[in-house]
Swiss-Prot record:
Protein's GO biological process: translation
Keywords: ATP-binding, Ligase, Nucleotide-binding, Protein biosynthesis
UniProt organism field: Campylobacter lari (strain RM2100 / D67 / ATCC BAA-1060)
Known catalytic reactions: L-glutamyl-tRNA(Gln) + L-glutamine + ATP + H2O = L-glutaminyl-tRNA(Gln) + L-glutamate + ADP + phosphate + H(+)
Record InterPro entries: Amidase, Amidase_CS, Amidase_dom, AS_sf, GatA
Name of the gene: gatA
Top EC class, one word: ligase
Record has Ligase as a keyword: yes
Protein name, UniProt field: Glutamyl-tRNA(Gln) amidotransferase subunit A
Function field: Allows the formation of correctly charged Gln-tRNA(Gln) through the transamidation of misacylated Glu-tRNA(Gln) in organisms which lack glutaminyl-tRNA synthetase. The reaction takes place in the presence of glutamine and ATP through an activated gamma-phospho-Glu-tRNA(Gln).
Domain of life: Bacteria
Lineage: Bacteria, Pseudomonadati, Campylobacterota, Epsilonproteobacteria, Campylobacterales
Length: 454
């Protein structure tokens, strides 16, 4: 499959031929569910002249439907481009294809979509991860050369790990959220899914930087990372031992072998522990659900999106539009968020979760003040079956090693390091200080090359 770096050197005619090839592949592999239905019927001329990049269905593209894979937004057409889309168009790239996702980015399986589930391209009985499962499946199966997703608690890194591609979440505020449908405003971050680390750096350089349209955008200097990539830096890496011990045997053995290879290649490895990751899960789901309950209050059937026809008055219209439009997982998180923000429980849950968040960030900072990067798992296991997770709590625990990175606002990247005996991918996660993406990408490139040359 052609890489993003190679495609950026294509002529206009070669780009057109590439788009035709990708469109044909998407139709042939429609069963994967990587793309939502309406994309397959679009005219190729609607995508622009640039190199094609697939876009998750919660990022605004002017004149394209924006549905967040939800029934409640069926028929809604975005009136403007997200800032990341504007940046793509300015750099000889163009949006090409709407990627499937968990409804409103709430999930770890890409099975809660209104359009139906996305399948793992390496084993169709397994989940591709979520919520950016469509983005990961598209890149991993050759239906896209690169893709944009969003990461609120691991939604770029975990599906990248399950599908075997690179998933990179920049530090909070490094990439504009203007035009991203909000789930949890203090945690959401647009990220990239690519075939390799160099492509991730190239695409990141295009979309990163300060944006005055986004009040949470970080107004700090940004320098492109791709031209300065250096795989030869011998970095000091902190391995989170207690997290590696919590993974299953396949993942644990692959990560331990990777650590040995890093040592053999001159990296200084130190071992650290972080607090019990189940505390991260509790804090994350309280904060994320609270913010989601506020953000999703705008979907009321009045201003945009789907309106219920079964109503005799305004109150009934609100209730029926939301009851009919939202899926089960979204309703569950709205109810949880409303509960923890209610007057009797705000101090008991929400305030305590915010204190835990500050503590988590402090612990990461203590380690990163002494080390260049952190090395830890992306997920406790390889991709699992669609029916293996029986309860919402089990699903929430699949994000156990990724959500703390969002709580701390740090950058993280998922890099493939091996496969199990069934051919399912295993990835390692590297984490950097806030806004030190250059070091993160240098380390990831080095890790990628070590794995290729083993």
């Amino acid at each position: 499959m052609v890489t993003l770096e190679e495609a950026l050197k294509f002529s206009k005619e070669e780009i057109i031929n590439l788009k035709k090839e990708l469109n044909q592949k998407a139709k042939e592999q429609k069963h994967l569910g990587a793309y939502v239905e309406q994309f397959l019927d679009k005219d190729l001329s609607e995508s622009g002249d640039g190199v094609p990049v697939a876009i998750k269905d919660n990022i605004s593209v002017k004149d394209w439907e924006l549905t967040c894979a939800s029934k409640i937004l069926q028929g809604y057409v975005a009136p403007y481009d997200a800032s990341v889309i504007t940046n793509l168009r300015k750099n000889n790239l163009s949006p090409f294809g709407r990627c499937n996702m968990d409804e409103f980015a709430m999930g770890s399986t890409s099975a809660t979509s209104f359009y139906g589930k996305t399948l793992n391209p390496h084993d169709n009985t397994k989940v591709p991860g979520g919520s950016s499962g469509g983005s990961a499946a598209a890149v991993a199966s050759g239906l896209a050369i690169a893709s944009l997703g969003s990461d609120t608690g691991g939604s770029v890194r975990q599906p990248a790990a399950f599908c075997g591609c690179v998933g990179f979440k920049p530090s909070y505020g490094r990439v504009s959220r203007y035009g991203l449908a909000a789930y949890s405003s203090s945690l959401d971050q647009i990220g990239v899914l690519t075939q390799n680390v160099k492509d991730a750096a190239i695409l990141y350089d295009v979309i990163a930087g300060y944006d005055e349209k986004d009040s949470t955008s970080a107004n700090i200097a940004f320098e492109p990372t791709a031209p300065k990539l250096n795989a030869n830096k011998k970095l000091k890496i902190a391995v989170i031992k207690n997290y590696i011990d919590q993974t299953n045997d396949d993942v644990k053995q692959a990560l331990l072998k990777t650590i040995d290879m890093l040592k053999a290649n001159g990296y200084e490895i130190v071992y650290k522990d972080l607090m019990d990751s189940t505390f991260d899960v509790a804090a994350y789901y309280i904060i994320a659900a609270a913010e989601a309950s506020a953000n999703l209050s705008r979907y009321d059937g009045v201003r945009y999106g789907r309106r219920s026809e079964k109503c005799d008055n305004l109150s009934q219209m609100y209730i029926n539009s939301r009851s009919e439009g939202f899926g089960e997982e979204v309703k569950r998180r709205i109810l949880l968020g409303t509960f923890v923000l209610s007057s009797g429980y705000y101090d008991a849950y929400y305030i305590k979760a915010q204190k835990a968040r500050r503590f988590i960030k402090q612990k990461y900072e203590e380690i990163l003040n002494d080390c260049d990067l952190i090395f830890m798992p992306v997920a406790p296991s390889v991709a699992f079956g669609f029916n293996d997770v029986k309860t919402p709590i089990q699903m929430y625990l699949e994000d156990v090693f990724t959500i703390s990175v969002n709580l701390a606002g740090l950058g993280g990247i998922s890099v493939p390091v091996g496969k199990n005996e069934n051919g399912l991918n295993i990835s390692a996660q590297l984490i950097c200080k806030a806004y030190d993406e250059q070091t993160l990408l240098d380390g990831a490139l080095s890790l990628e090359e070590i794995i290729k040359n083993k």
